[in-house]
Amino acid sequence: MILPTNFFVTTIILLFILIFLASAIKIVKEYERAVIFRLGRVVGARGPGLFFIIPIFEKAVIVDLRTQVLDVPVQETITKDNVPVRVNAVVYFRVVDPVKAVTQVKNYIMATSQISQTTLRSVIGQAHLDELLSERDKLNMQLQRIIDEATDPWGIKVTAVEIKDVELPAGMQRAMAKQAEAERERRARITLAEAERQAAEKLREAAEIISEHPMALQLRTLQTISDVASDKSNVIVLMLPMEMLKLFKSLSDAAQVYAKKEKEKEKE
């Protein structure tokens, strides 16, 4: 009976040693750190790699140092100009001090989520609707700064905050659609008015030129008649003013005088 008893005791001792070694050996990945507690007191952070702790007397809490993505659930709030909105966001953060993340707050992920929700409601409540829709980058930076300052004592670094979706009441959406349509019509009217102004300016310049050179209008009229007459299918009926007839007579007389001078030169 002595042999079985010794075998049983040896087995128990070996099993205890294996359990002791399994509890003493710790392997921490490259992106992790182990916060070591000895008899309830923090003695520091270890890792990455292999290390040993004293079971029963020491305890290791593993902390992930990678950037984590935290979805902030939809928050219902009212903007500064009294427009009810539903907004959600996403927060990117990482642990930079694992000891603080373990000792300064019970659950740093939940705490970061809660502070992100309250900050989102606060910032949106201080902004106008136009800012929320058109200056989202500015609000993102403001959110990132406030949340980062609030979580800094926990060893957390907030790297970015992005507002994802902004939901407006149906009535507000229709009103904004009408406003956008009115804005497009206003711009179209401004463009048309500018074109008419430029056309009027050109007409004014032309009128000034014609008033300074009356013959220019008559020559332009003759050019137009010539262009129309080039098409043989057109039948032209002209009601010419006296000034135009006088112009024709002057041109005819000038042509006759010129022809007479040419003949005299030939005789000489």
Swiss-Prot record:
Its main location: membrane. It holds the Pfam family Band_7. Keywords: Coiled coil, Membrane, Transmembrane, Transmembrane helix. Residues 125-152, 178-213 form a coiled coil. It is a single-pass membrane protein. GO terms for cellular component: plasma membrane. Gene3D superfamilies: 6.10.250.2090, Band 7 domain. PANTHER family: AT06885P-RELATED, BAND 7 PROTEIN-RELATED. Homotrimer. This is Stomatin homolog PYRAB06580.
